[in-house]
Each structure stands twice: as structure tokens, then as C-alpha cells.
Design a protein with these regions (language model features):
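Conserved NTP-binding/hydrolysis module of P-loop NTPases
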Residues: 28, 88-90, 98-117
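A short, basic N-terminal segment
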Residues: 2-58
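Residues immediately C-terminal
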Residues: 70, 147-153, 161, 182-183
Length: 183
């Protein structure tokens, strides 16, 4: 068996961080897991974070839109990290095939609860948990649905019904949908 041609050979010299060492960098640039405190805080990012914080404070519905790769999810990470943990409970779901049952299950699990099996029971359970969270713990729930452009009609209807609380007189949570702009 012959050895591969030399142009297919990869040699790592100096370990996996040779790039950082060569350019005297503290961190790998443009990595997906960049800490949000290291993000460049442009005026546009500050405005988006301000609007999202307003939506969280007022328990509103918000939609974050943008093209693929423009930093929607990174912005959401920055937003989540900017919120006061003693005032807000952030729940995040990203599932292209999210069903209403799995939606409630995912949120209730993030609250430390085992979800009821039936969708209606799980919805009522979530409303009770939110009332306890707000009344006893004084936490405002913030639900973030990433990749929401992939949700089907049934799931979008369920989200709409979830926000109808106390005969539509109160929003039980801030809801933020993160969607890809149509191509």
C-alpha cells in the first residue's frame, strides 16, 4: 500500500493552539463558543439587546429575524447573559420538529418538573408553575424559541394559545421567536 501524496499530509506543530501562539492571541477568533462579554458591542447590538430587555421586562412577544449566519443565536446568548438571574428565568428551546407536547415537556423540564403526558394537562401544569414562579419566587419567565421559522402551523397555534392567559388580559411570559429571513 502506498503512502498518501504529500499534499494530503497534515502536520500539527506546537500543539492545537499554534495559531493562537503565532499571532499572540488569547482566544481563537470567531469561535462559536466565544464568551458574550468578548463580543463587540456595536450600537446595533446594544439596540437589539435593549429591545429584548424591554420585551422581557413587559412580558411581551418579540421576533428576532436575520439572514443565516448574522448572529441571531449569538445575540440571544448575549441577551440571556445580560439578564438578572434573580429577576428572570430564561427557558430556551431549539427544535425544528417541536410538537406542542414536547414544547411543554421541554419548558417544564427546564423548570425542574416532570411534565404531564397529555398536552392539555401539561399546558395547565406550565401555567401553574409560571404563576408560582411569578408569585412566590418573583421571577419573570422568558421563553426563547430558536429556529422558529421551522415550526409547523399546529405549534405556532399552540404558542398563540399559550399567550392567551386570564381571558387575554395578561401575558404569562415574554416570548421571543428567533427566525431565519426567507431566502
Amino acid at each position: 500500500m502506498s503512502s498518501p501524496p504529500p499534499y494530503l499530509t497534515v502536520r500539527l506543530i506546537g500543539g492545537t493552539n499554534m495559531f493562537e501562539e503565532f499571532y499572540c492571541l488569547k482566544h481563537t477568533p470567531f469561535s462559536r463558543d466565544i464568551p458574550t462579554e468578548h463580543l463587540y458591542r456595536s450600537s446595533m447590538l446594544e439596540e437589539i439587546l435593549g429591545r429584548l430587555e424591554y420585551a422581557a421586562r413587559r412580558q411581551l412577544f418579540a421576533v428576532v429575524t436575520g439572514d443565516c449566519g448574522t448572529g441571531k443565536t449569538t445575540t440571544i446568548r448575549s441577551f440571556k447573559n445580560s439578564l438578572n438571574n434573580s429577576r428572570y428565568m430564561v427557558m430556551y428551546l431549539a427544535d425544528s420538529k417541536l410538537t406542542p407536547r414536547h414544547f411543554y415537556k421541554g419548558l417544564l423540564e427546564q423548570l425542574g418538573c416532570e411534565a404531564k403526558f397529555y398536552r392539555g394537562d401539561a399546558k395547565r401544569q406550565l401555567h401553574r408553575e409560571i404563576e408560582l414562579m411569578q408569585g412566590i419566587h418573583h421571577l419573570q419567565p422568558v421563553v426563547i424559541l430558536d429556529e422558529a421559522h421551522l415550526l409547523d402551523k399546529e405549534m405556532l397555534e399552540e404558542v398563540r394559545f399559550l399567550l392567551n392567559f386570564r381571558m387575554d388580559s395578561k401575558s404569562p411570559m415574554a416570548l421571543i421567536l428567533v427566525v431565519l429571513m426567507p431566502i
